[in-house]
Amino acid sequence: IIYFHYVKEYESRSSVKTEGFYTAADKGRYVRNMYNHRAFGTLCNKCVRTELYKKNRIYFPKYSYAEDCYVTTQLAGYASSIERLDEVVYHYRKNNPSSITRQGRKRRKNEYAMNFLDLYEKYRDVPLSENPVAVIFDDILIQAGWYSIAYGLDLYTKYPYLAEGIRKARIRGGSDVWLPMQVLVKLYSLFR
């Protein structure tokens, strides 16, 4: 994988999006940072060798929201080489009124959680040594629990394993879910 910076074009301004520095040696950190929005989980700022898709089973999401991150976390987890091109290469237009990101917040959060719970289901039985996304399992479960509580999504009913998975998950910094909310999610899951 070669990744690079990009420019996000808004209607009246533009913003350079600079990616941090990652290598294959710390791809677990890269995968976790992509999931937790501390690195770009987009495909638009990456070049990926076709061989990475052919050599590994790369799954594609059921829902539209966060589809890039769903794929890039797998690709980065499998990559034997990750290099940064320290240049702006791509321009991303943000002013598309029909964009998926213009959906209502509840719908976006629901699709995000369901996509990544699907990814969790696909990889949960894969041995750690072969698992490209195991590093984000706790984040996936806790975030789904948080979204279920905060947005009234009823994910605990739809995914019966969710409460038990959250009870086993570790509370960690660097997550999109604030530490006190992670504690709340774990407590809530004790009674599910």
Language model region names:
Residues 128-137, 171-178:
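Structural motif
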Residues 88-96, 102-128, 143, 150-165:
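Catalytic core of nucleotide-sugar-dependent glycosyltransferases
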Residues 149-192:
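Membrane-interface aromatic/basic loop that binds lipid-linked glycans or pyrophosphate carriers
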Residues 118-131, 183-192:
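Long, charge-rich low-complexity segments
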Residues 1-83, 92-108:
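Donor-binding/catalytic cores of nucleotide-activated saccharide
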Residues 43, 48, 52, 87, ...:
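Generic alpha-helical secondary structure signal
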Residues 135-147:
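Amphipathic alpha-helical repeat scaffolds of TPR domains
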